[in-house]
Amino acid sequence: MSDEYDVELTEEHKMLRDMVRKFAEKEIAPVVEKDEKEHRFQRELVNKMAELGLFGCPIPEEYGGNGMGYLAHALVTEEIGRASGSLRVAFNMQTMGTALSIFKWGSEEIKKKYIPALMSAEMIGCFGITEPDAASDTAAMTTTAIKDGNEYVVNGRKMWITWSPVADMCVLFAMTDKKAKHKGMSAFVMDMRSPGVTAIEIKDKLGLWACPTGEIIMEDVRIPTGNLLGEEGKGFGYLMQELISTRLTAAAGAVGTCQAAVDESIKYANERNQFGQPIAQYQMVQEVIARMVAETEAARALVWRCAIQKDRGLVNNMRETVIAKYYACKAADEVPNLGLEVLSAYGYSNEYPIARILRDGKVYKILEGATNIMKMIIATDALGIKKANR
Ligand SMILES: Cc1cc2nc3c(=O)[nH]c(=O)nc-3n(C[C@H](O)[C@H](O)[C@H](O)COP(=O)(O)OP(=O)(O)OC[C@H]3O[C@@H](n4cnc5c(N)ncnc54)[C@H](O)[C@@H]3O)c2cc1C
């Protein structure tokens, strides 16, 4: 990467990126392998990221953000994702899936209560959409929120919720009118310490070992009506809009994963000697490196296009967000695989980071919408069946 050729970035963007890169190299890189092996969630590092103001790029200063915008958010997310897939999730849990949703749809009271606390990491956030039997088909969710005086009574179960075992609050989607299907969905802010909320960690997963993920069981949980986001019954529309934001973050994190794989592979190719010279001299190794670099840069270009559009006010750019998400997340699966070809046997050992990068890269094709769903949105838009940008 050459700084002067990054023509899309302002000097401010470059300074921010350099600052975050230095932070990640100094604070995250030395502990990442140990934290992953020990499945240790680093709350202290989340606090440090908050102290540096990293969560606040798309949030106005008035609510504790810095208003630097979406491209700044993508740059920060990539740099943290490059160092740790587990810590990358913070940019959806503190910002896009929580603070930004509350900023868009919350009452003034709710905004003041939650957004600054998320920005400073005084509160840890999560968002609950997926259920055991309602995943890609979000409108099939069965968690209910039934109005009872000044409160909603919530019953149901959420599955695969990032940070739920450590979270203080949750942006929760539930059915206020089950019969109305997607028109009966609403969004709430739920206090995770409320009576009736139980979060159970899913401990044995393929990757992201330092990132607690869990189920949320809700039994007669009472949420004040003031914690309803926007209007009752409009939750499905809000969910789609929230996903347009969270998918940008996932795509930016995926680029970080790709870049980490590129870095490790280049280093190794130059250091590893076989047949009397570095393997970097062999054309077949160069071919692999070329593909890794090109895939990473292509993914980054799509992420930046999407973020720049949002910075120009085109925040509902579903089409471009989904294209970036599809491409970058596919690359986060493929580029570390290519890295394993370069590192070969040593890459198969946990002595080198490529094994962790490969494991963590797998998740991007699943979360914030599986790859098939991205392809479906791209194709139905292209075929004129359903316009993605509305
Ligand atoms: C580590 C991790 C963290 C997560 N964090 C969160 C979180 O914080 N909050 C949250 O709400 N959710 C979270 N999720 C859930 C995630 O968003 C879902 O896993 C995702 O939406 C897809 O659901 P599924 O994996 O159950 O797949 P399913 O929906 O069961 O689909 C299975 C397969 O069928 C395909 N498929 C489904 N429908 C179609 C169709 N119509 N056409 C073609 N193919 C189709 C899918 O592409 C997929 O390949 C997380 C998941 C993981 C693994």
Tell what function each PLM region has.
Residues 126, 140-144, 151, 169-173, ...:
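Conserved hydrophobic/aromatic beta-strand scaffold that supports enzyme active sites
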Residues 1-93, 105-110, 117-122, 135-138, ...:
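Alpha-helical interface subdomain recognition
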Residues 99-105, 127, 139, 179:
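Flexible, glycine-rich active-site loops centered on histidine and acidic residues
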Residues 121-129:
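A short, Trp-centered hydrophobic/proline-enriched beta-strand micro-motif
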Residues 68, 137-139, 163-168, 181-184, ...:
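Short glycine/proline-enriched turns and hinge-like loops at secondary-structure junctions
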Residues 91, 118, 133-136, 160-163, ...:
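Short Gly/Pro-enriched turn/cap motifs at secondary-structure boundaries
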Residues 140, 193-224:
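Flexible, small-/acidic-enriched active-site or ligand-binding loops
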Residues 150-151, 155-199:
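A short core secondary-structure module
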